[in-house]
Amino acid sequence: MEPRNDAGSILISRILVWVFGALILVLDWAVWPLSQVLMRVLPVFDGGDAVLLKVCLYVCNVPGFILLYCMDVLLRNLHRGQVFESKNVRLLKVISVCCFIACVVCLAACPRIYSLGFVALAAGFMGLIVRIVKNVFSKAIPMRDELDLTV
């Protein structure tokens, strides 16, 4: 069986990380006119909801950009062939914590803006998946070290 070359996939993933970063920046700007449209179109969406939505978005930006940075570093490590390394486990841990922070922020705003409950659910589920992958990586590192010593 030939070894796979995932350089193309890693490059696409890195490009998508940067695209998502750009989209977050666009959303940071677009939330102002978008919230005005929502107040006109949805009768249940008032000025207080618009402020809460903006606060929620800007608070979630901090873990969001940290998450994107960690994903980019992780992809660079994978491109270099550094897969089962403790620094990748740390990056995965930070990524999962960022997901959980976004989940908590959206849950806090959920009683007022119900649709943020779906965002909270998605962020929490993503955090759980990344946390499980982190646990797999952390178990694989000692196994790899033991295998390296055996060979």
Predicted regions and their residues:
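Alpha-helical transmembrane segments of multi-pass membrane proteins
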Residues: 22-35, 127
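Short, aromatic-rich membrane-interface segments at the entry and exit
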Residues: 112-124
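Cytosolic juxtamembrane helix at the C-terminal end of the final transmembrane segment
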Residues: 71-78, 129-151
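Membrane-helix boundary elements
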Residues: 29-61
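Hydrophobic alpha-helical transmembrane segments of integral membrane proteins
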Residues: 90-115
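Membrane-helix interface/capping segments
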Residues: 65-86
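Cytosolic juxtamembrane helix and N-cap/initiation of the first transmembrane helix
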Residues: 1-27
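Helical transmembrane-bundle signal
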Residues: 17-28, 64-70, 100-106
